[in-house]
Design a protein with these regions (language model features):
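A conserved position within tetratricopeptide repeats
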Residues: 1-2, 37
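Fe(II)/2-oxoglutarate oxygenase catalytic core
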Residues: 11-18, 24-243, 247-285
């Protein structure tokens, strides 16, 4: 069996981890990932190394029983333990999560996004189409079920464990990139009820009730996330995350206090993982 079989087995690993049409089973997911790696599928081999916190050279890749050895080194109980969550602000509700992603996971996600990012888009409130707009000048890459992996699935699971926001409510995650001068000007993440372009999305997919941003690197300057109505901004360390509710806790209505911006980067290149969460289970895409 070759790469084709390995790719199919790796897809089964993702489905097992995410609980698609079955209960989530991370032990089975790791076992399937090992099988995929043994079939020669490089992405599965890389994911095992990331989950085990190992660096592989040519000699290591040639070793007998390497992939099972790596799997035994994965601290699955630790990875499936909720990361610490600390409240940073009450209105709007903002929390900081320590170590949502490991350093190896951050590097993997940057590499995964680097070859795929394209100009970021915003939703047009009149048409519902996603369009390029000067309000957002960075780049983004989305990863639906067809091209997600166990590293992305683990960030979603760890967010669920910390916050109670179920994996199946989470949209496809996006890796974001901002180079010098690029920014995301003041905006809201919620969908405005009654707007013709958004109402169908609200009716079918629900409101975007929460946003989680995970910092993937720190070799840049500027680029803080600023909440303009409360005069508060934040920038996390690699692997740390910020979770905020886009709706009021009292009545679940859109919260105008969440007006926020990604400030311009002044040196280097900023990488983030963005995760939006809806108020209901999402279609499988």
């Amino acid at each position: 069996m070759g790469e084709g079989s390995g790719a199919a087995t790796e897809r089964l690993a993702v489905l097992a981890a995410m609980g698609v049409a079955r209960p989530s089973d991370w032990v089975e997911a790791i076992n399937l990932l090992v099988r995929s790696a043994e079939q020669g599928y490089r992405p599965a081999q890389g994911q095992l190394a990331v989950l085990a916190g190992a660096t592989l050279g040519p000699a290591e890749r040639a070793a007998d029983d390497l992939w099972k050895t790596l799997a035994r080194r994965i601290d699955l109980k630790g990875l499936l333990r909720a990361p610490p969550l600390e409240q940073a602000h009450t209105q709007p509700a903002i929390a900081l999560l320590s170590g949502l992603a490991t350093p190896a996971m951050c590097d993997w996600l940057i590499a995964k996004g680097a070859g795929k990012v394209t100009p970021g888009k915003v939703g047009d409130s009149k048409t519902g189409e996603w369009v390029v707009d000067p309000v957002r000048t960075g780049e983004a890459a989305g990863f639906g079920l067809a091209d997600t992996d166990l590293i992305l699935a683990l960030t979603q699971k760890r967010l669920e464990l910390a916050s109670g926001l179920h994996v199946h409510q989470q949209e496809a995650p996006h890796v974001l990139s901002y180079q010098v001068g690029q920014e995301y000007k003041a905006h809201y993440d919620f969908l405005v009820p009654g707007e013709p372009g958004f109402q169908h999305l609200l009716d079918t997919m629900g409101q975007r009730v929460a946003t989680c941003l995970t910092w993937l690197n720190d070799d840049y300057e500027g680029g803080e996330t600023a909440f303009l109505r409360i005069d508060w901004k934040h920038r996390g360390k690699p692997g740390d995350a910020m979770l905020f509710l886009n709706v009021r806790t009292s009545d679940r209505r859109p919260d105008g206090a969440t007006l926020h911006a990604g400030l311009p980067v002044t040196r280097g290149r900023k990488w983030l993982l963005s995760q939006w969460v809806r108020d209901r289970v999402q279609p499988i895409v």
